[in-house]
Swiss-Prot record:
Signal sequence extent: none
Protein name: UPF0340 protein EF_1967
InterPro entries, per the entry: Antibiotic_NAT-like (IPR028345), DUF436 (IPR006340)
Pfam families in the cross-refs: DUF436
Family named by the database record: Belongs to the UPF0340 family.
Amino acid sequence: MTIDEKMLKEQLVTITEEVITAGNLKKGDLFVLGCTTSEVVGGVIGKNSSAEVGQWIVSTLIEQLDKKGISLAVQGCEHINRALAMERRVAEEKGFEIVSVVPQLHAGGSCSVAAFEKFDEPVEVEHIVAQAGIDIGDTSIGMHVKHVQVPLRLSIRTLGAAHVTALYSRPKYIGGPRAHYETTQERNR
């Protein structure tokens, strides 16, 4: 399958803006990407990695999120225990444990490799708590998004050939029968 770089980037910007808006993300928040470029290019997860598509996706997200002061973490595959690439500064500020691994095309994946190349001072961490994220190709990012996770129905449901889903988080509702709650939409006003 041939991927149109311009279209992919435009669609990714639209998807990301929808997540930022729905999740009411702000400066200092953390955004997680799970992605299999194999699925984007029409293959099977883990079997047809595309370094080029990984570069397009990660560079687009970094550019878009940096403008808003939102940090990116990129989930690797199960061959590196789904460790995440991120900036050392962010890992240290948030108190995440740094682990020792350098992602490779077939052990971490294209997007992890791209993030490691594009970040100023990349590190890998084992666990994070992100406010929201995008999952390109059904890689399962839920383990990295803060509770309570809210699935988001996107206007664009595929990127290339990959199914795309997204999550954002909201505070837990607590209290009894008299409690009232502010919705995400009310917070966005």
